[in-house]
């Protein structure tokens, strides 16, 4: 789906569910990570997360578009457009838009695990962050630490 298709889809959803035209721009923003979309107050544009379209399909994207259009139309009308406002929640129910989008299934980042061993007492330390072995010593016997392994 490209920029023109998403613009057309947002305009269609606006007319179908809100019976009002969408007169601004709708674009995909690849930098969005934790949200399905956002409505920009100053420019009145809507930005959408392309990954939600890839992972969940057009149906979830339409739900996100309806949610952002609720912000848009209420803000344009001068009514309460924030999540906590009654006008916003009532309009969400009216158009059957989700209040929150689904959680993104993100590929778990490889969690590096560093293992260190005391050269004196053989106590092992497991850490998620690397330790400067020249600066830090064993907490039990004050012996030097040596790295054993780094797993990812």
From Swiss-Prot:
Q: Does the keyword Iron apply?
A: no
Q: Where's the active site on this chain?
A: 68
Cofactor(s) demanded: Zn(2+)
According to its UniProt record, what is one Pfam family this protein matches?
Zn_ribbon_SprT
Give the signal peptide as a residue range, or say none if absent.
none
Task: State the similarity comment.
Answer: Belongs to the SprT family.
Question: This chain belongs to which protein, by name?
Answer: Protein SprT-like
Q: Which organism is it from?
A: Bacillus cereus (strain B4264)
């Amino acid at each position: 789906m490209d920029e023109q298709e998403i613009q057309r889809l947002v305009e269609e959803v606006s007319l179908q569910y809100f019976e009002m035209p969408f007169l601004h721009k709708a674009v995909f923003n690849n930098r969005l990570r934790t949200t399905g979309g956002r409505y920009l107050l100053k420019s009145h544009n809507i930005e959408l997360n392309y990954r939600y379209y890839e992972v969940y399909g057009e149906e979830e994207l339409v739900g996100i578009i309806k949610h952002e259009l609720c912000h848009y139309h209420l803000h344009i009308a001068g009514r309460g457009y924030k999540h906590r406002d009654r006008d916003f929640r009532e309009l969400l129910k009216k158009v059957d838009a989700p209040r929150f989008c689904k959680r993104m299934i993100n590929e778990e980042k490889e969690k590096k695990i560093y293992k260190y061993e005391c050269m004196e007492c053989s106590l092992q330390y497991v850490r998620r962050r690397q330790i400067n072995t020249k600066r830090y010593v064993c907490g039990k016997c004050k012996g030097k630490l040596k790295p054993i392994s780094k797993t990812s």
